[in-house]
Amino acid sequence: MEEWKQYNIGEICDTISETYKGNASDVVLINTSDVLEGKCLNHTFVANKNLRGQFKKQFKKNDILYSEIRPANKRYAFIDFESTDYIASTKLMVIRSNDKVLPKYLYYVLQSKEMVEVLQMLAESRSGTFPQITFSELAIQTILLPEIREQSKIVDFLESIDSKIALNRRINDNLEQQAQALFKSWFV
């Protein structure tokens, strides 16, 4: 096993500011409130006309959307779908990995408790109306990075855990619905 190497985050990814130039009649607008703890919550198409000025950024599959505002609110998402007609708010960083890091590995690093705490502390240290970070501040954070093969093993392991957590949530939701149905049948 090779030794892990230290990198600044800016050495393994870029912030993407590609303006959406598509001409689809309908698009999906993604704001900071539409991403949470890894998921993109909004997939509702709206008419592509008179769009508010904040919706400009194009993104694609395997990109990471990360809110510039209040990192501790966990407003980030890994894009695991084709996003041709999706447009992100300018308050979301679009982060794209390079060939040194797997996109999902980078996502796991950026959403880790330790990284979120560091970014929140940086955000709170800035003057302004609300805690905010920039890609420049993110880019100088250092991480230890294994070789790609090891990253793949780590991602597989973490995805397995995430799948089990998601399954448990679905089971809990189902049990809650069953309990409510029983309660209604007994007491209503």
Residue ranges and their predicted role:
Residues 1-20, 144-188:
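Non-catalytic DNA-recognition/assembly elements of restriction-modification systems
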Residues 6-64, 79:
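Sequence-specific dsDNA recognition surfaces
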Residues 9, 39, 88, 102, ...:
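N-terminal alpha-helical segment
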Residues 32, 97, 143:
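Active-site donor-binding loop signature of nucleotide-sugar glycosyltransferases
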Residues 55-115, 134:
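A short beta-sheet element
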Residues 78-79, 124-126:
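Short amphipathic beta-strand starts and helix->beta connectors
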Residues 86-92, 126-155:
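A short glycine-rich beta-alpha junction/loop motif
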